[in-house]
């Protein structure tokens, strides 16, 4: 395609499997990764997306939490222990790129859930980042950015933030009504806040939601459980977006291939991140479902610190994934701090070269 497109045009056309000038390049980098790149020569004050000529991730997320009191319980040399607005207690390490360790969950029973539910249904003006929108939206529009609303709902954010994994998995089998009420409340409150943003005159191109449904080699639950308990809410989110002229992207880490036929059936437009290290095979998915859904990611992040290996992987995967449209270049999760500035330069250059149509 001879014409150069804006980011917004390029990404929307990719979602719709239409001709583009090149594949979009949308990824996220760890804090430690960006710090390393600055130490190795990337100018301070320049975004890494601009430096490497990537497209930009613009996402706005309303707060549909129960507003549990967030406070610091303990301070240590290497970590602090705190409560979160979702009712969990976690140990947060000071090292860059560390993952908090969740110690306990307050809303871990159906009875306590009723308290959380009422708190989530309570409206507060500051659930929406109005000042952030007012300050940045004109710039996004002027620069032709693709903009997503982050919808906060599903299995992942419920088990990891609210109830605990074991409690949620048991609930899927023994107390499905409780699990579905959680999914429903999360979705209703999040979409209501998103609608307020649209009603205020802000225009968005798509929705995005996190719902990690797999780990290494297997999903957390069966396809039947997905169909009966979770898919109806995924479908509602997708329909909500499509009714408003927006596209829908699902981020689901882990091995979720057994769920793909049902995910495709919901009408999801784009799937991310195609986690190779968990067992996902991007080329297989492209062959089976590439005419029905787009793919975002799939370049094994464990290879990015070995430039020869990651280049070979890109040369193997990108030509197949971009065929017929519907592919966005990215790692299979995010860019780790093992990736040097020089490696990232070469990766970005090759992605641009292989991604041209």
How would you name each of these model-derived features?
Residues 1-35, 40, 81-83, 112-357:
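Active-site loop segments of alpha/beta catalytic cores
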Residues 69-122, 143-146:
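A contiguous, low-structure linker/loop signature
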């Amino acid at each position: 395609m001879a014409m150069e497109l804006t980011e917004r045009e390029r990404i929307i056309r990719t979602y719709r499997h239409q001709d583009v000038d090149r594949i979009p390049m949308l990824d996220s980098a760890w804090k430690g990764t960006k710090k390393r790149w600055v130490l190795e020569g990337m100018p301070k004050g320049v975004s890494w997306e601009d430096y490497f000529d990537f497209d930009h991730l613009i996402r706005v997320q309303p707060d549909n939490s129960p507003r549990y009191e967030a406070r610091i319980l303990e301070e240590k040399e290497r970590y602090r222990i705190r409560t979160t607005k979702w009712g969990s207690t976690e140990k947060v390490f000071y090292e860059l790129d560390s993952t908090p360790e969740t110690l306990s969950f307050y809303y871990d029973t159906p009875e306590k859930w009723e308290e959380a539910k009422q708190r989530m249904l309570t409206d507060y003006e500051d659930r929406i980042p109005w000042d952030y929108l007012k300050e940045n939206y004109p710039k996004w529009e002027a620069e032709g950015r693709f903009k997503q609303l982050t919808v906060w709902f599903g299995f992942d954010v419920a088990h990891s933030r609210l109830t605990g994994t074991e409690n949620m998995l048991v609930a899927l089998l023994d107390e499905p009504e409780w699990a579905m009420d959680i999914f429903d409340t999360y979705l209703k409150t999040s979409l209501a806040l998103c609608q307020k943003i649209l009603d205020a005159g802000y225009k968005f191109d798509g929705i995005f939601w996190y719902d990690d449904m797999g780990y290494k080699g297997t999903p957390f639950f069966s396809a039947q459980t997905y169909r009966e308990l979770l898919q109806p809410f995924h479908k509602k989110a997708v329909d909500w977006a499509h009714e408003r002229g927006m596209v829908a992207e699902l981020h689901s880490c882990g091995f979720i291939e057994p769920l793909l036929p049902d995910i495709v059936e919901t009408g999801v437009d784009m799937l991310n991140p195609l986690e190779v290290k968990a067992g996902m095979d991007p080329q297989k998915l492209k062959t089976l479902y590439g005419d029905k859904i787009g793919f975002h990611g799939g370049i094994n992040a464990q290879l990015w610190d070995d430039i020869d290996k990651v280049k070979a992987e890109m040369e193997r995967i990108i030509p197949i994934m971009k065929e017929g449209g519907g592919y966005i270049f990215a790692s299979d999760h995010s860019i780790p701090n093992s990736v040097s500035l020089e490696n990232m330069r070469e990766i970005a250059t090759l992605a641009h070269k292989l991604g041209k149509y």
